A protein has these predicted regions:
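Bacterial N-terminal signal peptides that target proteins for export
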Residues: 1-9
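Bacterial N-terminal signal peptides
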Residues: 8-18
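Sec/Tat signal peptide C-region and signal peptidase I cleavage site
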Residues: 18-24
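Short, glycine-/small- and polar/acidic-enriched structural segments
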Residues: 25-174, 185-195, 211-213, 219
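Solvent-exposed, polar/charged alpha-helical surfaces in well-ordered, non-transmembrane soluble domains
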Residues: 42, 46, 83, 87, ...
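Pocket-lining segment of extracytoplasmic ligand-binding domains
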Residues: 169-170, 175-274
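Secondary-structure end/capping motifs
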Residues: 233-323
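Conserved C-terminal helix/tail region of periplasmic/extracytoplasmic solute-binding proteins
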Residues: 309-353
Length: 353
């Protein structure tokens, strides 16, 4: 009898613990994505609102269930996203190609997705009396130093045959610089900023105009999702990358479809400085989305990105944004490069698996 009871208890115990490995297998790994308010990056906040994903830890949307990962969204201002990524406080972050280089020196990084490129979204705005770039030699030009603002300014000077040393680019937060110009504060006759500050300044102060902008350097400022190699190497790291990419393209389908376009733009606008649909239509003209897998693959597998990165790296080294020349790699081969452009995740999402 005791033997029968012992066997019974043993059987019950084995039945109970047999479920533990199954539960462990079902535990979904959590990966974090840091994002800030910007047209193409706000897509992830909108995806949460649309319930395509659930940005809360421990909650899953259909795309997360599809790929078997839990995407935790961490919204912060842009500078904080850069710091968080460099400090390993997130697995991936929405960063530009330029701003991915410095953290990549300490944390090998992979560009998994291009989201957009500036096509007028970064601009030098001046008062009506300034009509020629040479007039800026006598003025301070305010903008955020060592960012895409200074890059836009310097590259346009180069294209116009001007010397950077002849001009005064003065470090200032773009929001503060835009506000000072809008309020007609003395000395603020030229600023370099990005949207929404560009549109806000032009709308609020009618005696200003764009002297030059990022349309002259098409494709050089690339907005991306950058992921750490150490996160990719974790179990389900590739699935997380694919889930992020899948999410972005699903939102773009809503932006592109006539029946859902306006609502999607309004949702983006609410996540991006509370702009209305008409303003957002202008914004997405000036911020060209890489809205399909084919568009993303064309960039990541083409020669243009290599030429662009040569220019960006040179600028970053010359302006001491990076302490040394970062190694840039292309393709799916694992490396310890500061930044590697890898198309394999887009390819996987495009294939539907």
């Amino acid at each position: 009898m005791k033997k029968i009871l012992a066997l019974s208890f043993t059987g019950l115990w084995m039945l109970a613990v047999s479920g533990i490995p199954a539960l462990a297998k079902e535990k979904i790994p959590v990966f974090t994505l840091a994002w800030s308010e910007y047209p193409s990056w706000s897509a992830f906040g909108v995806a949460h609102e649309y319930r395509l994903i659930d940005g809360r830890r421990g909650k899953l949307g259909p795309i997360e269930k599809k790929w078997g990962v839990d995407i935790e969204l961490k919204e912060a201002d842009y500078d904080t996203c850069i710091v968080m990524y460099g400090a390993k406080q997130c697995d991936a972050a929405c960063l530009t190609n330029m701003d991915s280089l410095a953290p990549g020196l300490a944390r090998a990084s992979v560009a998994i997705l291009p989201t957009s490129t500036s096509d007028g979204a970064d601009a030098c705005i001046v008062t009506k009396d300034i009509t020629d770039v040479k007039q800026l030699k006598e003025a301070k030009v305010f903008g955020l130093a060592k960012t895409v603002s200074e890059y836009t300014f310097v590259r346009n000077l180069e294209l116009l045959g001007e010397k950077e040393a002849d001009y005064q680019f003065t470090n200032m937060d773009p929001g503060a610089a835009a506000l000072a110009m809008q309020q007609k504060q003395p000395g603020f006759n030229a600023i370099v900023a990005w949207n929404p500050f560009v549109l806000e300044t032009l709308n609020k102060r009618k005696d200003t105009h764009v002297l030059f902008d990022s349309t002259s350097i098409k494709g050089e400022i690339i907005d991306m999702v950058t992921m750490a190699q150490d996160a990719l190497d974790r179990p389900k790291g590739m699935a997380f990358a694919c889930a992020v990419i899948d999410t972005f393209y699903e939102i773009n389908k809503k932006i592109e479809h006539p029946d859902t376009r306006d609502d999607a733009l309004v949702a983006l606008g609410e996540k991006f400085s509370h702009l209305n649909v008409e303003s957002m239509k202008k914004v997405v003209q000036q911020t060209k989305f890489y809205s399909t897998p084919d568009a993303g693959l064309a960039l990541f597998t083409g020669n243009e990105v290599r030429t662009t990165m040569d220019k960006v790296v040179k600028f970053c080294v010359d302006h001491e944004i990076v302490v040394k020349d970062p190694e840039i790699a292309y393709g799916s081969e694992h490396s310890n490069a500061a930044l590697r452009f890898d198309p394999q995740f887009i390819i996987k999402v495009k294939a539907g698996n």
